[in-house]
C-alpha cells in the first residue's frame, strides 16, 4: 500500500495527463495584457548632422597651421562642427601638406563642402552651409597644388 501511494505520487509528478492545469496557466498568461512600453519615435543616428546655422548664432572660421599630418583629424572635426577653416601650410613639409589636402578633400566631399586654394600655401575649407564666391586665379599655379617651396 505504501508502495502504491509512492508509485502514484511519482506517476502524478511525471505524468502528462493533467493538461488542464497546463492550459489554465497558458490562458492566464494570454489574458494578461503586455506591459506598455513608451514608443520612442526619435531617430537615433549620429550620421545625420544639421548643417543649418541657428538664427542669431555666429558662424565661426578657424585659422590653423598644421605641423604634423595628424592635425588633419582636428581640422576635419572643425568641418564636422560646421566651422570653416583657413589652413596655412607654411610650417609643414610639402609631402605632409599634400596628404592633409588629400584627407580634407575626402572630408569635404563627404559633407558636401568645398576646398579652395586662396594663396601659395593657404587653403580655405568649408562645410556645406558656407558659400565660397570669387576667384584668385592669379595666385594659383596652373599645375594645382604646388608646395615645392616648402621646407
From Swiss-Prot:
- Answer whether the UniProt record assigns the keyword Mitochondrion to this protein: no
Q: List, alphabetically, the InterPro entries matched.
A: Cell_div_SepF, Cell_div_SepF/SepF-rel, SepF-like_sf
Query: Alphabetically, which GO biological process terms does the record hold?
Result: division septum assembly; FtsZ-dependent cytokinesis
What's the stated role of this polypeptide?
A: Cell division protein that is part of the divisome complex and is recruited early to the Z-ring. Probably stimulates Z-ring formation, perhaps through the cross-linking of FtsZ protofilaments. Its function overlaps with FtsA.
The record's subcellular locations are: Cytoplasm
Q: Which family does it belong to?
A: Belongs to the SepF family.
What is the official name of this protein in its record? Cell division protein SepF
Q: From which organism does this entry originate?
A: Lacticaseibacillus paracasei (strain ATCC 334 / BCRC 17002 / CCUG 31169 / CIP 107868 / KCTC 3260 / NRRL B-441)
Amino acid at each position: 500500500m505504501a508502495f502504491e501511494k509512492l508509485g502514484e505520487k511519482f506517476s502524478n509528478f511525471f505524468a502528462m495527463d493533467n493538461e488542464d492545469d497546463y492550459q489554465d496557466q497558458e490562458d492566464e498568461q494570454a489574458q494578461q495584457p503586455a506591459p506598455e512600453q513608451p514608443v520612442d519615435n526619435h531617430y537615433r543616428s549620429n550620421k545625420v548632422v544639421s548643417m543649418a546655422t541657428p538664427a542669431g548664432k555666429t558662424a565661426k572660421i578657424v585659422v590653423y597651421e598644421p605641423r604634423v599630418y595628424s592635425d588633419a583629424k582636428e581640422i576635419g572635426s572643425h568641418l564636422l562642427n560646421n566651422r570653416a577653416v583657413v589652413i596655412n601650410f607654411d610650417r609643414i613639409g610639402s609631402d605632409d601638406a599634400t596628404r592633409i589636402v588629400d584627407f580634407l578633400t575626402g572630408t569635404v566631399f563627404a559633407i558636401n563642402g568645398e576646398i579652395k586654394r586662396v594663396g601659395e600655401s593657404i587653403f580655405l575649407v568649408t562645410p556645406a552651409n558656407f558659400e565660397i564666391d570669387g576667384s584668385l586665379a592669379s595666385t594659383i599655379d596652373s599645375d594645382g597644388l604646388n608646395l615645392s617651396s616648402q621646407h
